[in-house]
From Swiss-Prot:
Places the protein is found: Secreted
Pathway terms, separated by semicolons: Lipid metabolism; butanoate metabolism
One BP term from GO: butyrate metabolic process
One example GO MF annotation: hydroxybutyrate-dimer hydrolase activity
GO CC, one annotated term: extracellular space
Protein name as catalogued: D-(-)-3-hydroxybutyrate oligomer hydrolase
Reaction(s) catalysed (UniProt annotation): (3R)-hydroxybutanoate dimer + H2O = 2 (R)-3-hydroxybutanoate + H(+)
Length: 699
């Protein structure tokens, strides 16, 4: 690994200014620069590492298709002190497997995977890809933002036909978070891949020890790391010590506790990742101008650049395309984007010619409502037979559902004299809030898996700019006793491998979501018979009563759905119960048609039987009912590539009517093309009508 020095943290522009007029002219924003220079937002040094494509590589970290598919995760020579290379390998392994179905029957190795080429054929062997990585922080000079930027340049990159694909992390994952969702496709296409962690990045601070993570996942104390940490809680050491005394074994997380509302900058940092990629490509392929420095070979707009990713990363790509004023982005392809749309009067979402009950709500609204109601709605008749996605005994989960319904009823929040009727009313309220009946069997697993509670707590903290010491709504993040759920000291600190195994949103890697009640902190599911209803109700009230500045901070993350006439594709599963399609993609497409009118080049593909987490598709009940949305994300990328390179028309907006695999839960037959009809140029009755602010999706 080599280091390329960047700017000073105290004054990022000073070092560049001292180098003289020619180099100063190459700084961020100068379209006429002749010398390649790091953008002004790059803080500290750039780490450059070459990978041979055998012992280590860009896509699989040397594991290959077989290693990524193995249930045995890569280990460490010294478990107490893993190296940066070992942590990187584990991060690539964990993040790849977190976004796709990794089972052969589910499509791995057949429809996707390192061995599968872009035509869908098994021709690439273990699929290792040689190339170079560039790693650095983006910062605003404060040393507290520290967004991780990473550029991978494959050895197959053709300087005469350059391309970039963005792979902004999904969720709150680290910088490799979208390696399976967008990075893999870009690397196979021979494109540079521009990653960033969105300023969340799995950064944590262990309050009791003061240990924090660095850019490469290795650890340091907050005092020794200084401004080089991925994240350090902003409170003083004395305040944190007092907090630790009252609430031991707690953790601060960057997305939740940075007090920066990082989502408001997700579009900006995605653009910065692209600009950093331009710098890296000029550094690698630009002419040498004075024996040491490189000239400018590529200027904004010279490189075919597709902004791509899924979930939060997909929303970031859309936001970046809207904010692009310099021609960095050529086109957009995103899957299941989590996006908060600023809706204007007259915009409408319809299904089957009838207006849907609700659309375009922000995540802060629908997530806090779902977190409150889902444990009760899970007991509804319509949810019978839902996949079970919890480590708790079924009896405990059933008790939680009954007690949550009873507490909701006592509070006047649901009606009904018994659990069945209360659950039916809870589900009806979710329908009224824009959830589809297609998601009925997903309401239970979204809460049981703790996906929805995790999101409700993390985003409420972010949108209120809360500190870890605030214990917002009496929730915090802590290690717990695996039997009782009570807060307890860990046998081994989860910080050691957090960079490699964590996902940035507790519960993750042994750090759990706890409710701080009268008896101390306990796993939120077990803290009270109704699974911490008081905390869930508090989170809901933050939104409904517009408390602690939540409305202002949510407004800061809304987008206008103006893609500036860039060609774009959105893919979304109709059954998505985490990011409901009515509030995200359908709302975005409708608003885009009002904003851009006939100049819009946006196509929307809605996938029946598609849901948010392809990694769940191997779970019994998921395997028989749901199909991989990732398959269509890759098809959409190929369609966009052909559109940009050969002028092939993008297929119009349409519903893709997939066929579930069926069979016995846990033993569904192998996925085949019979389950996955293609995106077509003439969708007929499956066409989605979009015009003048109105979207009408066929039933």
């Amino acid at each position: 690994m080599t280091a390329i020095r960047g700017g000073s943290r105290r004054a990022p522009g000073l070092a560049l200014a001292l180098l003289g007029g020619v180099l100063l002219g190459a700084c961020h924003g100068d379209e006429n620069a002749q010398v390649n220079a790091l953008p002004g937002f790059v803080s500290g040094s750039v780490r450059k590492t070459a990978y041979d494509g055998a012992s280590d590589d860009l896509l699989t970290a040397g594991l290959g298709k077989t290693g990524l598919g193995s249930d045995t995760r890569p280990g460490f020579a010294n478990p107490a002190q893993p190296s940066a290379a070992e942590l990187r390998r584990l991060a690539i392994y964990s993040n790849y497997r977190a976004l796709v179905d990794i089972t052969p029957n589910g499509g791995y190795g057949r429809f996707w995977g390192p061995n599968v080429d872009l035509a869908g054929n098994d021709t690439l062997g273990e699929g290792k890809i040689a190339g170079t990585e560039y790693l650095a922080y983006s910062d605003d000079g404060s040393g507290r933002k520290n967004v991780t930027l990473l550029v991978q340049v494959p050895a197959s990159f053709d300087p005469a036909n350059p391309c970039i694909v963005t792979a902004t992390a999904s969720g709150s994952r680290g910088v490799y978070g979208a390696i399976a969702a967008a990075g893999e496709w870009g690397l196979k296409r021979g494109c540079a891949v521009a990653y960033n962690d969105k300023g969340g990045g799995n950064g944590a601070h262990e309050i009791g020890t003061g240990v924090v993570t660095l850019i490469d996942g290795t650890l340091a104390t907050a005092s020794s790391a200084g401004s080089s940490s991925l994240f350090t809680a902003s409170e003083s050491s004395s305040t944190l010590a007092a907090f630790n005394s009252a609430f031991p074994n707690r953790y601060a997380y960057k997305h939740a506790h940075s007090q920066q509302n990082p989502e408001q900058d997700w579009g900006l940092v995605t653009l910065q990742a692209v600009e950093f990629a331009y710098w890296a490509l000029n550094e690698q392929f630009g002419p040498v101008v004075d024996g040491t420095r490189h000239g400018i070979r590529y200027r904004p707009g010279d490189i075919t650049t597709i902004a791509a990713s899924v979930s939060n990363g997909g929303g970031s790509a859309l936001a970046a395309a809207e904010q692009d004023t310099r021609g960095w982005i050529t086109a957009v392809v995103v899957g299941e984007p989590q996006i908060n749309v600023r809706m204007t009067p007259g915009v409408t979402v319809e299904q089957g010619g009838a207006p849907v009950p609700s659309f375009g709500r922000p995540l802060a609204d629908y997530a806090t409502l779902a977190n409150l109601l889902q444990p009760c709605a899970a007991a509804a008749v319509a949810a019978t037979g839902a996949p079970y996605l919890s480590a708790l005994p079924m009896g405990v989960t059933q008790s939680i559902r009954t007690q949550r319904c009873a507490t909701l009823a006592a509070a006047g929040l649901v009606s009904g004299a018994d659990t069945a009727s209360q659950a039916s009313d809870a589900l009806a309220q979710l329908y009224a809030a824009g959830y589809l009946a297609d998601s009925d069997l997903l309401q239970a697993p979204m809460w049981d898996s703790q996906a929805m509670p995790a999101i409700a707590v993390t985003y409420a903290n972010a949108y209120t700019r809360s500190r870890v010491t605030d214990n917002l709504c009496n929730f915090s993040f802590a290690t717990t006793n695996p039997v009782t759920g009570a807060v307890a000291a860990p046998a081994v600190s989860p910080m050691t491998n957090l960079f490699g195994a964590g996902n940035g949103v507790p519960p993750t890697n042994g750090i759990n979501l706890v409710f701080n009640g009268a008896s101390g902190g306990v796993d939120h599911r077990l803290a009270t018979p109704d699974a911490s209803f008081a905390g869930a109700f508090c989170l809901r009230q933050l939104w409904t009563a517009n408390q602690l500045g939540i409305g202002t901070n949510v407004d800061a993350v809304r987008v206008a759905a103006n893609l500036q006439h860039k060609p774009a594709i959105i893919v979304h599963g109709r059954s998505d119960a985490l990011v409901p399609v009515n509030h995200a993609s359908r709302a975005y497409v409708a608003q885009n048609s009002a904003t851009e009118g006939r100049a819009s080049q946006l196509s929307f593909y809605e996938v029946t039987n598609g849901q948010h987490f392809d990694a769940f598709l191997s779970v019994p009940g998921f395997d028989t009912r749901f199909v991989p949305v990732h398959y269509y994300d890759e098809q959409a990328l190929n369609l966009m590539w052909n559109h940009l390179k050969s002028g092939a028309p993008l297929p119009p907006s349409q519903v893709i009517r997939t066929v579930p695999r069926g069979g016995v839960p846990g033993a569904a037959p192998a996925l085949s093309t019979a389950n996955l009809p293609p995106i077509v140029q003439s969708p007929g009755a499956n066409a989605i009508a979009v015009n003048a602010g109105v979207i009408d999706v066929p039933l």
